[in-house]
């Protein structure tokens, strides 16, 4: 068994073998894609090939894919110029002008969008999969209602893409954000999908100025290695999605069954409409932050919430949105599995977490 047991795949994923091979293959392709000589032309060809491959994975057109440095940048770019309606469980990179509430399971009742005052807003955004509790939202249904109100729709698909099917035409979204390191690509690269029809209605403005890259909409020299690695990583994730989800789901259910045998344990949210890799659980009287710290001493990597908020001793806004008290939210941990995990690792983690919960409770008495 590995010395390190990595159970925090919602924070980031290991670089997959397909992405590693692409990086090694193109390490010497250093030409600036904006240059007119042959080295630059070769780099442009690599970028456009990756754009086509990524577009195919989500049923988009190549010219609808714009490369960014991250999912957060893609989210910020998508929403920066618009008054936006969101939900109360969004990632912090999503600005909130008005929010639609979720139920105790973290799911948006899409019918609530019929009652929203759209008069002063131009865009609605809802994340496809929540980064803390793994809830899958009814994006297609929300988009239909939003469009019926003559509004535009964006979805943050950072936790969805590569893990559940994403078809932008089926979902009928106008914009969609993604981040490479959530599905096996290196950090520092993501993309924003912008539908061609949406661009006809709105004059898309750049968030980052300084050059004419990405059709003049994002300044800055492109991250060639990140881009050429992201394409095969996404292809690999899409190709093996069904079998990996089945395997990871079995591991998740076995681990969850063991953890729920601990007295005073509670699953946050529901297993229904949830990605197969996610567990968000709390233990009465046990600090989530303390449990995470102790697990680290045993080589187990878990989190007490979103990686973007680690180190902040405030209760999760997502857990509070589904009805938890501050104390219950602070007593929660997040475990997110990947296809690299083994049954042996899961059994070890269950055993260690059970013992640590007992230890923390004993120390508090």
Would you name each region that the model predicts?
Residues 1-365:
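Pyridoxal 5′-phosphate
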